[in-house]
Amino acid sequence: MSTTVRPDEVSSILRKQLAGFESEAEVYDVGTVLQVGDGIARVYGLSLVAAGELLEFPNKVMGMALNLEEDNVGCVLFGESNTVKEGDTVRRTNILASVPVGEAMLGRVVTPLGEPIDGKGSIETEIRVPLERRAPGVIFRKSVHEPLQTGLKAIDSMIPIGRGQRELIIGDRQTGKTAVAIDTIINQKGKGVFCIYVAIGLKGSTVAQVVNTLEKYGAMEYTTVISATASDPAPLQFIAPFAGAALGEYFRDTGRHALVVYDDLSKQAVAYRQLSLLLRRPPGREAYPGDVFYLHSRLLERAAKITDDIEVARKMNDLPDALKPLVKGGGSLTALPVIETQAGDVSAYIPTNVISITDGQIFLESNLFNSGQRPAINVGISVSRVGGAAQIKAMKKVAGTLRLDLAQFRELEAFSKFGSDLDKTTKAQLDRGARLVEILKQGQYIPMPVEKQVAIIFLGTQGLLDAVEVPHIRRFEEEFLSMLEHKHPEILKTIAEKGTLEADTAKQLKEAAERFVSSFNQKVKA
């Protein structure tokens, strides 16, 4: 006998099954890979994609939309392009390229997309901000007025840097550009400045060496290293500086001070040129695309000193929603971009672009470096256009004539090579100049506190070192500063606290120096 199903049973079974039915389908905007190669993919579809949006390719390879054309989208790939093939499906993520920001990033080595590569576990941050952001408008800025001490005598005395400034470090390869930047980062210890070191197109071993140096000198606790090495895809080298700027802006907008080093922007320009040519954008001078100036200007304009008025700061343009509740006034972001020149040619395309964007440049020369003057700064063509307003009064007072004295010394030195009979004044000037050059020399990774710099430069410019033989200047400096620290700490303390060199302090310093010079000379002769 066949079992019959009653109609009411059928309806109850259907009801049961329909009750568990999920009607929501996941909707994705997808496209198809038409062509792939050299880290570039052409994708058909994705008609609603935004420029700079992240795209998901198979095998978890991420990409970014750069060229939005009528019939296809030109994407750059952040992973291995050999895992992507023609006909693959590409998904939109509806997320613009962004980077995680926060205190958790300090002490870590990350990729330009914020993924840790130091083996210390994942990074827990609540806030992500877009890589690209418009620079603060004029109304939200304040003029640069606080010093950012580098700890290098030649820079802090003649090419002072202020918080919120953009100062270019330019020179040939192997002239100590990275060393100047690393010394500056080490010198920020205990000064409340958060540092970001962006390595673009450097060797992996060089980045590891930088990280080891920062750890050795205790600088890693307030520093983040963003690494896009030479072996990383060109798109990562292109976005790395923007990731550094975004992280620096987080500290700037929350009322703190940050320093970002871009090492170096020449390699970012090369990576951008590579992407642009592969995307078939028209080439310009030196085959760089027409917007390579805009590439660097929009990056470096993000370094700024923000107004102290918190109400005005809260209205800042392009502020990410996640940052709005945290905004405070008075923060700053200082940028130290690095540019590598070829055979000292500062009139090439990229160097001239960046010189015109920044607020001054520190020019390093290979012949000075090879002659033993380190840091190898050519003070003749190095300038700081806004740093003078940030220099402490004591330094301004003692180093006022330093640049002129050195310029005259260089000129006289060139002429003295032709003639042997020099009058007394010329000889005295040459002797003084040789001593000034000697006191500006400094070892690597030993930045000097500003009060000690003021003391030793005061001795040099006042002629108190004229009695010390040139070969003994470095030893004299070391022993004199050690003596000041132990026997006259009040002199250094007064300079550090007041930021000025009062007449009585100068008198004390002069007397202490005169006594020490005579005892030092006796010791040397003995």
From Swiss-Prot:
One of its GO terms (cellular component) is plasma membrane. The record marks S382 as: Required for activity. Pfam families: ATP-synt_ab (PF00006), ATP-synt_ab_C (PF00306), ATP-synt_ab_N (PF02874). ATP binds at G171, D172, R173, Q174, T175, G176, K177, T178. It is an enzyme of class 7 (translocase). Its main location: membrane. Produces ATP from ADP in the presence of a proton gradient across the membrane. The alpha chain is a regulatory subunit. F-type ATPases have 2 components, CF(1) - the catalytic core - and CF(0) - the membrane proton channel. CF(1) has five subunits: alpha(3), beta(3), gamma(1), delta(1), epsilon(1). CF(0) has four main subunits: a, b, b' and c. This is ATP synthase subunit alpha. The lineage of its organism: Bacteria, Pseudomonadati, Chlorobiota, Chlorobiia, Chlorobiales. The gene is atpA.
